[in-house]
């Protein structure tokens, strides 16, 4: 692997606890949600650009914190990160602007969700509304699986408050492709498409997993 610690006279510093990262960059052990310490560190080190990757700090306003301190930062602000942080918000937004997506219903109570499942067609997809480390989506083949999924998300709180609200969505087949675009308010730059193979095991088996 190419050494990127000093590209063209610069330096890469990662907020990371993963030992593999430390082979290619300087790593600092600061909590990813400790914005005060992260902002202070960036200021002390005269960091030219901060790139925020993980979902949780983006949703909590990490980019806003760096911007408020006058530090250049790449990533969506809190009011934009909600597109990832709330599936219900995203689905409602797509519905409002007629952006095609799978049919859905949103539920705040397990009783209402279970009642809906009595007549819903199977298979069906259950999604925790909030962030769940890439694991909050359940594809259920039978009504029994779907009911157990509601229990897992809303009653057992397997993903904490992320499951306080759930989205029950139409099951669709086909290839899933991600296309990212960078936008500055005036210009859109579309990146190369990519596929995220989310299952933990080969052959589309196992639970969904974010891959780290």
Segments predicted by a language model, with ranges:
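ATP-binding N-terminal substructure of ATP-dependent carboxylate-amine bond-forming enzymes
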Residues: 1-78
